[in-house]
From Swiss-Prot:
<keyword id="KW-0131">Cell cycle</keyword>
<dbReference type="GO" id="GO:0043093">
    <property type="term" value="P:FtsZ-dependent cytokinesis"/>
</dbReference>
<dbReference type="InterPro" id="IPR007561">
    <property type="entry name" value="Cell_div_SepF/SepF-rel"/>
</dbReference>
<keyword id="KW-0132">Cell division</keyword>
<feature type="compositionally biased region" description="Basic and acidic residues">
    <location>
        <begin position="28"/>
        <end position="42"/>
    </location>
</feature>
<dbReference type="GO" id="GO:0000917">
    <property type="term" value="P:division septum assembly"/>
</dbReference>
<comment type="function">
    <text>Cell division protein that is part of the divisome complex and is recruited early to the Z-ring. Probably stimulates Z-ring formation, perhaps through the cross-linking of FtsZ protofilaments. Its function overlaps with FtsA.</text>
</comment>
<dbReference type="Pfam" id="PF04472">
    <property type="entry name" value="SepF"/>
</dbReference>
<protein>
    <recommendedName>
        <fullName>Cell division protein SepF</fullName>
    </recommendedName>
</protein>
<feature type="region of interest" description="Disordered">
    <location>
        <begin position="25"/>
        <end position="54"/>
    </location>
</feature>
<comment type="subunit">
    <text>Homodimer. Interacts with FtsZ.</text>
</comment>
<dbReference type="InterPro" id="IPR038594">
    <property type="entry name" value="SepF-like_sf"/>
</dbReference>
<comment type="similarity">
    <text>Belongs to the SepF family.</text>
</comment>
<keyword id="KW-0963">Cytoplasm</keyword>
<dbReference type="GO" id="GO:0005737">
    <property type="term" value="C:cytoplasm"/>
</dbReference>
<dbReference type="InterPro" id="IPR023052">
    <property type="entry name" value="Cell_div_SepF"/>
</dbReference>
<keyword id="KW-0717">Septation</keyword>
Length: 152
């Protein structure tokens, strides 16, 4: 017997080996009165193509806001990871040197831009970094201090 015939006999069934038994059952007539009412009620309802489906992104466990006060530039990556994980971050840069704070803001601005989020100044050296799933409304007016000259 060739290999081809072996595969053929393995994958095919011989009809002679199996006899199918057909059982004829007598079925009781179904009461049409109840079924007709249910069908009529079902057909009266207008069929719309739109189902009640909820997007997975709209259902979240809970939103978190992370408060961060970096002391060195190396902590900027940890803040960026929070933003990438779709958490809003408030960054307080009051306890870091100005040049380091500027580098952190530049780094976070790139991160926020890459994910389609937003960065806003909410106070003196305090910034709010938000991903695209967080909407911020309203503004905070700047308070002028005696140290800062007025910019005309």
């Amino acid at each position: 017997m060739s290999i081809k015939n072996k595969f053929k006999s393995f994958f095919t069934l011989d009809d002679e080996e199996y006899e199918y038994e057909y059982i004829d059952e007598e079925r009781e007539p179904v009461q049409e009165e109840k079924g007709t009412k249910d069908k009529a009620a079902f057909q009266e309802r207008p069929q719309t193509g739109k189902q009640n489906v909820v997007s997975l992104q709209s259902v979240q466990k809970s939103s978190k806001v992370v408060l961060s006060e970096p002391r060195v530039y190396a902590e900027a990556q940890e803040i960026a990871d929070h933003i990438k994980n779709r958490r809003a971050v408030v960054v307080n840069l009051q306890r870091i040197q100005h040049d380091q704070a500027k580098r952190i803001i530049d780094f976070l601005s790139g991160t926020v831009y890459a994910i389609g989020g937003d960065i806003q100044r909410i106070g003196s050296n305090i910034f709010l970094c938000t991903p695209d799933n967080v909407d911020v409304s309203g503004t905070i007016s700047e308070l002028l201090t005696e140290e800062e000259p007025q910019r005309w």
